[in-house]
Regions:
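Hydrophobic core
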Residues: 9, 13-17
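Positively charged n-region of N-terminal signal peptides that target proteins for export
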Residues: 1-4
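A residue-level marker of the well-folded mature domains of exported/periplasmic proteins
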Residues: 20-378
Length: 378
């Protein structure tokens, strides 16, 4: 009888899969479970090869593995009202776990969470300041957020880049939002420390695209950055990497990726080993772990928290939520080895190296590294 009931339940739930979704939605993964996962995108789309895409892929893979309903939604515009509209559409279609990547969701969470107490809201890169101070949400009884210590990932990428012999650097951030600022400031601090240790002169041209995608204007600005001497540019902002890499490819230049190991993307698209390294945060792993906690019925162990993920171990690189690729994704050499990297990670973990995480100022500062601050390109 139990087996028959289970079969009927699967058929009943599968039948509902024919319901249509939002204006832009991936094919829903529709099986059976009490947990139904929706993801709403922020500024970008699930093809940004970075933050949105990684979150989407983590949610989709988890749903497929566990037989859960999954669908993604893309807001019509870049504002809280449109984000709330997609959240409400997802809830109306039966989704009860809403995953939202990006600080811009703070206002939407603050508006929607109190109205839908039976729904679990998961915000990635949504800080206490964003959610509580800025958006004014005081009741987190159905909310869990994660922030990442991007300054550590940025530091490690900047340190590695200079140690590997690059002293003419560039930085192209997406928009001057907290996570992007922390990445960039960390990159500057790491490059500064490495230059000081090596006793070399180093400089960085520092700009923001003021958007999270590449276009002709950003490419022209990157052309100028490489023409002005940059050997490698940190492409820190979703789709802006297209402009950085297009400009780099014209002069056989180099690039640093962000959020995930972008070497497979960069190198394949531009036909040579363009990637020095990537400043990564554990989006995929932390999204998967959160969804597993929910599926295991342990939501009460994390709800109401804003987790701040960084280094969890001085020795186990795989346990850390921030870092650079330890495999082929980094351009290792005798100048900077995996053992050298492990020592820096241990020094940060043990407090020997302290990294400033100030995200209040878009313009970074350094002691040895010379900074040419360009500001917004657009």
């Amino acid at each position: 009888m139990k087996k028959l009931f289970a079969i009927l339940l699967v058929l009943a739930v599968a039948f509902t899969a024919f319901a249509q979704g939002s204006k832009e939605a991936a094919p829903a993964v529709t099986k059976t479970a009490d947990v139904a996962i929706a993801m709403v995108t922020d500024y970008g789309d699930i093809t940004d090869q970075s933050f949105n895409q990684t979150t989407y892929e983590a949610c989709k893979a988890f749903a497929e593995k566990n037989g859960l309903n999954f669908k993604y939604y893309k807001p019509a515009g870049d504002n809280t009202a449109d984000r709330v509209a997609m959240i409400e559409q997802a809830i109306g279609e039966g989704f009860n776990v809403i995953v939202m990547p990006g600080y811009a969701f703070a206002g939407a969470i603050a508006e929607a969470a109190p109205q839908y107490k039976d729904v679990k809201f998961v915000g990635l890169d949504v800080s206490e300041y964003d959610l509580v101070v800025d958006a004014g949400l005081t009741d987190l009884s159905n909310v869990y957020c994660i922030v990442y210590q991007e300054e550590i990932a940025g530091y490690l990428a900047g340190y590695a880049t200079v140690k590997l012999g690059y002293t003419k650097l560039g930085y192209c951030g997406g928009m001057a939002v907290p996570a992007v600022i922390r990445y960039g400031y960390g990159f500057v601090q790491g490059a500064d420390a490495a230059a000081k240790e090596l006793g070399v002169d180093a400089d960085i041209q520092y700009a923001y695209a003021n958007q999270f995608f590449g276009d002709a204007d950003i490419t022209a600005a990157m052309d100028a950055m490489y023409a002005n001497g940059a050997q490698v540019v940190f492409a820190c902002g979703g789709g802006v990497y297209t402009s950085v890499c297009e400009a780099a490819a014209k002069v056989n230049g180099k690039a640093v990726g962000v959020d995930v190991d972008q070497k497979p993307i960069f190198d394949a698209a531009y036909g040579y080993s363009i990637t020095v390294t990537s400043a990564m945060k554990g989006l995929y792993a932390s999204t998967t772990a959160t969804l597993q906690t929910i599926l295991d019925g342990k939501w009460d162990t994390i709800v109401g928290q804003i987790a701040n993920l960084g280094l969890a171990s001085a020795t186990d690189m795989d346990a850390n939520s921030v870092g650079i690729p330890t495999g082929a994704g980094t351009e290792w050499s005798e100048k900077f080895t995996l053992a050298d990297y492990a020592k820096v990670v241990a020094d940060i973990y043990n407090g020997k190296i302290v990294i400033d995480n100030d995200s209040s100022n878009a313009e970074p500062k350094a002691t040895t590294l010379k900074i040419n601050y360009i500001g917004n390109i657009k």
